[in-house]
Design a protein with these regions (language model features):
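C-terminal catalytic lobe of FAD-dependent flavoproteins
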Residues: 99-177
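Active-site lid/adjacent beta-loop-alpha segment flanking the redox-cofactor pocket in flavoenzymes
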Residues: 43-129
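Short, acidic Gly/Pro/Ser/Thr-rich loop/turn segments
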Residues: 20-21, 44, 74-75, 140-141
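A conserved short coil-to-beta-strand element within the FAD-binding core of flavoproteins
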Residues: 1-2
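Short, well-ordered beta-to-alpha junction loops that form the rim of enzyme active sites
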Residues: 17, 70, 136
Length: 177
């Protein structure tokens, strides 16, 4: 919302996605814009996810098919769908399922993925006492959400990490930059 205010806590996790750098300036996080759209196909037109080189089609329970997604690393925080982005998605539809180009487009949207120079998240403690970070998951935020939240909980509660969690933290440490 653009609101600026002070927030206090004993321990704080910075998990602001693509906007994380606005809170902690030395984080090497930058936004990568992704545009998507949905189409309405005939009933049961596709029953599984279709993957192509630059596009995927995902059937949803409500009958819509999600078409994703562009990867625009120079877009910064420029909002809105663009003709170029929509065209790229349509080309992807054409390559995967040409007849779907005739199906009505229902929704268009965009978002900003938090990315790091090595495309890996930053997870764990920072140099600031009691400040933790969990950001930069790029296109894998949903995939890494469970293990990230488990690790962050254990760190904050000062619980013992297992070998996988310890390896995960080392690999994605803030200190690698």
């Amino acid at each position: 919302t653009g609101e600026i205010r002070n927030i206090f806590g004993e321990k704080v996790i910075l998990c602001c996605g693509a906007w994380s750098k606005k809170v902690l300036n030395n984080l090497p996080i930058f936004p990568v814009k992704g545009q998507m759209l949905s189409i309405q196909g005939p009933e049961n037109s596709i029953k599984r996810v279709l993957f192509g080189p630059n596009t995927y089609l995902v059937p949803r329970d409500d009958g819509l098919i999600v078409v994703g997604a562009t990867v625009e690393d120079k877009a910064e925080f420029n909002q809105g769908n663009t003709p170029k982005g929509i065209n790229q998605l349509q080309e992807g539809i054409k390559s995967l399922l040409p007849e779907a180009l005739n199906w009505p487009q229902m929704e268009h949207w965009w978002g900003f993925r938090p990315c790091t120079p090595d495309f890996k998240p930053i997870i764990g403690k920072t140099q600031i006492v009691n400040l933790y970070v969990a950001t930069g998951h790029y296109r894998n935020g949903v995939l890494f959400s469970a293990i990230t939240s488990d690790i962050m909980f254990k760190l904050i509660q000062e619980k013992t990490l297992n070998n996988i969690e310890t390896t995960f933290l080392k690999k994605f440490s803030f200190n690698r930059f």
